[in-house]
Amino acid sequence: MKKIINFILGAFLALNLSASVAYAAAKEVRIAFFMEWATPNQEDKVKKAFDRAFGVPVKWTNFATGGEMTEAMLSGDIDISYSQGLTPFVNAVNAKAPIFLVDIAVLYGMGGTTCVVSNASGITKANASDLEGKKVAVPLGTMADYVFKETMRVVGADPSRMRVIDMNPEDGSAALVNGDVAMACLFGGKSIKKAEEAGSKMLTVAEAKDAGIAGIDITSVTNKFLKENPGMVKAFVEVTHEANARYNSGKSDMNVIAKDAAMDLAGTKKQMGGFEFPDASVMKKKYMNRSGILMTYLKVMGNMFATSENPALKNYGKVVTTKYLP
């Protein structure tokens, strides 16, 4: 009997040990995020909740654009990209990049991503076609690029006739203030605030909403990390959803979030006031189901940014999973 008990205990310990090793195959988790883009899970980032959930250290790296996040994932430097724009994700999977969409990070209106036109140019939505022939700053392949195309469609201007310059939001806002471009399309609280020192939004948040222009940021993971560390992916999503629930119930430490986002408290509250952090049930029923909003956006953007070299996928459901949602 003693031998049997010892055997069972030994087997139990071996099983737990193997499970632990499988869960913590990575010795470090490398996560991409954006500064000036305040989200509830930054409180958990600061308080090391992710490190505790993973059982290993976390290395957080700030990127200027979602395209840079993709490049870092492909080079093996990043495992998880948090709040990557849907546009750079679409561009990546159209190019057959080995990454997967596992969660929706943020839903937002055009308060967080917008196009600001120079006041000195005298251009508004009423004469937006005057932008044709002029320099416009756009971080190509990002959600701001999508907003640029959609905004120009709404105001009746032809983007192909503009001199589009690929600039990250910080540089784009500086170029607008310096008079080097007539319009800058950008994201991020500080960059938009800087741009508005010299310009005004082409469309108000309400006008953009009425036109159906909205943003979705997602969480993407490399296929390699997903295969080797599924438990860590699930842990990341769970901690993030716990943070979202805390924020939605008014219990987040906004001072901690603001400081980590490199923003002031008022700006952080204003920005996050325009964000939505849906729970898992809403995601499954409304966004990530076969005919859901996310899947529709993927198809629309996939075709919008498709090229002959990187055509749109026939089925974006193959690069999306709800398996890791709580």
Stretches with model-predicted labels:
Residues M1-L9:
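Bacterial N-terminal signal peptides that target proteins for export
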Residues I8-S18:
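Bacterial N-terminal signal peptides
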Residues S18-A25:
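Sec/Tat signal peptide C-region and signal peptidase I cleavage site
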Residues A25-V155, R163-D166, A182, L186-G189, ...:
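Short, glycine-/small- and polar/acidic-enriched structural segments
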Residues V106-V117, S200-F225, D279, V320-P326:
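Periplasmic-binding protein-like
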Residues I165, D171-D260:
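Pocket-lining segment of extracytoplasmic ligand-binding domains
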Residues K227-S308:
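Secondary-structure end/capping motifs
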Residues L298-P326:
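Conserved C-terminal helix/tail region of periplasmic/extracytoplasmic solute-binding proteins
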